[in-house]
From Swiss-Prot:
The modification Omega-N-methylarginine is found at R41. Keywords: Acetylation, Guanine-nucleotide releasing factor, Methylation. Expressed within the somatodendritic compartment of neurons, is also present on dendritic growth cones, but is not found in astrocytes. PANTHER family: DENN DOMAIN-CONTAINING PROTEIN 11, LATE SECRETORY PATHWAY PROTEIN AVL9-RELATED. Residues 15-187 form the uDENN domain. GO terms for cellular component: cytoplasm. The keyword Nucleotidyltransferase does not apply. Residues 32-41 have a biased composition (Gly residues). The gene is Dennd11. This is DENN domain-containing protein 11. Residues 364-455 form the dDENN domain.
Amino acid sequence: MVEQGDAAPLLRWAEGPAVSVPQDPALQAGGWVRGGSGGGRVAAEAPRRREPEEPAPPEVLLQPGRLELGDVEEDQVVAVFVVTFDPRSGNMVEWCLPQDIDLEGVEFKSMASGSHKVQSDFIYFRKGPFFGLACFANMPVESELERGARMKSVGILSPSYTLLYRYMHFLENQVRHQLEMPGHYSHLAAFYEDKKGVLHAGPGRGGSLPPVYWLPSIHRYMYPEMKITHPAGCMSQFIKFFGEQILILWKFALLRKRILIFSPPPVGVVCYRVYCCCCLANVSLPGIGGTIPESKPFFYVNVADIESLEVEVSYVACTTEKIFEEKRELYDVYVDNQNVKTHHDHLQPLLKLNSADREKYRRLNEQRQMLLYSQEVEGDYSPCEEDLFVLFFLEQNNRIFQTLLEVSASQDKTLTAEHARGMGLDPQGDRSFLMDLLEAYGIDVMLVIDNPCCP
């Protein structure tokens, strides 16, 4: 199997059998799963054509306030745009539909700082209540006016980032078309007319979107919109890149801290790290998370986002702008390549790996190796490695919160070292993490694990 680079196509549509829709989420044994399905890069091959007698697989993505049970989430492209770099004026929106939509700042979000150093890239970002995907390309030209390079991005906005990846291949083709034939927008206009969505006023139409919920069925439907086609997969790349430190990121993600990931361009693969980081915090137990902010993937951010980030209490984002490192009031955790750090004294203990963390990482790799062996020997690719990754942390999180809820419902509400070990935590090394977790989620228990540093 030939190994591919990070820029290889990652995601394509995953079709599956029908999933029955429950009448009441309370009737589901597993409860609801607060999900983070990510966008992704569409594979270059043409999509499989469905035969006439073959039923279309139903969507199972639900968003409270927008869709009813059993509804299908339709395409809702609310804007399409072309951004160009002008040597005299800088980044600017060259063309868009509809013409009256507010695209302020999109010219910087869709063309990341430092993009002139790469030939192509793709960028996920957030614009108010919408999510965006833009494909960037840089083409050498023999033009003194353009200083030897023509740079453009073609992108779209949608209320849901889980739908954006469907149009990756189209956007890649269109940005090349715009570079070679500037000013020809007929294909983009036809695309918008075909895909434009009608948005209705209602809950979640303000400055932030409602949380995304998934039907708790077979494991693969925790992200029904995606299927990894890359030989390594974005989850595998995430594990390989961060190694044992994914357990540090897991704790910060579960605590809903503000996590900012820095990396120079290309930024597309870093947007996937944002998504993977959000996947670490999935919980499917009812009653969990009502008092804590949702895990928000902001994807790419730049200096134009500083004002909006100042009011956020929880997010995961990435940037190519090093100046963010100096603005400590904007983040709790700063990730520079594989270096995870925090300036908050009370969070410093969470940066240290303990024996329980290493054991979890060992088990994760052991399960991955067993899965890969099964795939190679038996040819069984269901479940895939990405299913395993999501389920591993989902089950770990459920085990922790199930124990905490049981202790909080008991008469003495006492959480002991034995409870901590049963949750897969280190009684001493994870004491600070447990205290922060109890406070963040408002769980009423008494922690009686002694602190060895304090007599």
